[in-house]
Amino acid sequence: MKGQETRGFQSEVKQLLHLMIHSLYSNKEIFLRELISNASDAADKLRFRALSNPDLYEGDGELRVRVSFDKDNRTLTIADNGIGMNRDEVIDHLGTIAKSGTKSFLESMGSDQAKDSQLIGQFGVGFYSAFIVADKVTVRTRAAGDSAENGVFWESHGEGEYTVDDITKADRGTEITLHLREGEDDFLNDWRVRSIISKYSDHIALPVEIEKREEQDGETVVSWEKINKAQALWTRNKSEIKDDEYNEFYKHIAHDFTDPLTWSHNRVEGKQEYTSLLYIPAQAPWDMWNRDHKHGLKLYVQRVFIMDDAEQFMPNYLRFTRGLIDSNDLPLNVSREILQDSTVTRNLRNALTKRTLQMLEKLAKDDAEKYQTFWKQFGLVLKEGPAEDSGNVESIAKLLRFASTHTDSSEQTVSLEDYVSRMKEGQEKIYYITADSYAAAKSSPHLELLRKKGIEVLLLSDRIDEWMMNYLTEFDGKAFQSVAKADESIDKLADEVDETAKEAEKALEPFVERVKTLLGDRVKEVRFTHRLTDTPAIVTTDADEMGTQMAKLFAAAGQAMPEVKYIFELNPDHPLVKRAADTQDEARFSEWVELLLDQSLLAERGTLEDPNQFIKRVNALLLG
């Protein structure tokens, strides 16, 4: 026994409490949802542990949560007979936030209360939400399997510190008493509390009971009335479940405040029997890019909770999917290691992956506006799909959205089906360009001929795009073609060159040889091009060579890569090229050629190895 001690909250807890009390006040009734949700989790954990140790039930296997209030003392109590906590667990769970990235998350919070409320909601406030309506919270708990004298008392005013002490508690589980702030008497009203519980907790499998007091023969008789359906929502028939119930269940399992964009509820019977309920959130979780954070579904086996974040059932590129799977084919004592090597798991993963992709395809078809919300939140994650899941590339490709020259907007709204439907007669390929930004892609000289011919080009500017396009090779039988790479199909688009122009071009052949001699092995090849209308020169790469954006990706990852060898393509009709060709002075000629090459490299890469030399060269030529 350690006796009473007063401890300081972890600094992040203090910050979270302050933000939460101010940001969530307009939605304060959610504290009851959060506390009942925690009680439900405690019951799930007890059921799971009792599979291997039935003695943990201590002769009481009827799990429930009870809500009562004391109007005289202005307290509201939520009590469960779930797994309970020992002293160390109380300190870990109620005094600290054991989530990586918490500090940076809190630092990102600002003064925008609506935004803060959403962010805190997706962070998952849980127990601390009690302080929205209470100025003091008392907890009495005992872990299942411990003796009565190992109970723990915890109390705090939600400011800088809390008190923890040893107590005797005969029954296992956790009892949380909220000492309500002035003006919160609404939560001492029987009808009000019932309506909140019905609204938020009808879907959970744990019975929620409210205290009833009746006068009989001059005595007060206390009884407990169940006020929720207490049937796991996913086990009910879809036809019986209202949208509001699906939305509330999502908020319960995802600890999110906003409704999901869509969901898919399915029961499968036959070779494998399982029920899945999958949701697509409306906003990305704050820690979606945190590599330490686990993403996955809740796993139930025959309606018994087994684990959170079972990541084996969903590929990484669909890690935003929330929900659960309830399998009849896995053993109750299943572990993460068993899941890793299970044929059942692999089959379920394949089925759930297809189900999620179908759900997204349906959303895109039925509600373009909602799908655009999804794309803005999760498009970058979905773009990991072609590299990760070769078996579903066609399905993933249908879900991708791009900016393009057709829309003249940086918004990524164009689907590949849209693009193919607008292809010109005789066009065989889907043209795209990758660049560091939308502006750089849109203004690239590589687009000049295609714009002139009215051929649409997809404008890709996310860092992942170049990598993705290595795995996205075709769609609907049409190959993808980077316009920054040498390609006959683009060259064929150029207008037929008349005899006079051919003669003029032939006369310039010695100029090409002079350029080759000057540049040597700094470029792979020098040649004329008819791709350009306004630009004097560009650099391209061969189809099988590494492109500029891929080289940048490797460099950003700290890997040394061989230098990209460019093809230097000159526009024979451009006045600057003609001037360079007419220059006989070798020093002056060198300046013109170097300027044209630097311009081309700057347009392609966005940077030069020696920008100062480029500036000097431009200034010298301007002074003429």
From Swiss-Prot:
It is found in: Cytoplasm. Gene3D superfamilies: 3.30.230.80, 3.40.50.11260, Heat shock protein 90, C-terminal domain, Histidine kinase-like ATPase, C-terminal domain. Residues 553-624 are annotated as: C. Pfam families: HATPase_c_3 (PF13589), HSP90 (PF00183). Residues 337-552 are annotated as: B. Keywords: ATP-binding, Chaperone, Cytoplasm, Nucleotide-binding, Stress response. Its main location: cytoplasm. Residues 1-336 are annotated as: A. InterPro entries: HATPase_C_sf, Heat_shock_protein_90_CS, HSP90_C, Hsp90_fam, Hsp90_N, Ribosomal_Su5_D2-typ_SF. One of its GO terms (cellular component) is cytoplasm. Coiled coil: none annotated. One of its GO terms (molecular function) is ATP hydrolysis activity. PROSITE patterns: HSP90 (PS00298). Molecular chaperone. Has ATPase activity. Belongs to the heat shock protein 90 family. This is Chaperone protein HtpG. It comes from Enterobacter sp. (strain 638). The lineage of its organism: Bacteria, Pseudomonadati, Pseudomonadota, Gammaproteobacteria, Enterobacterales.
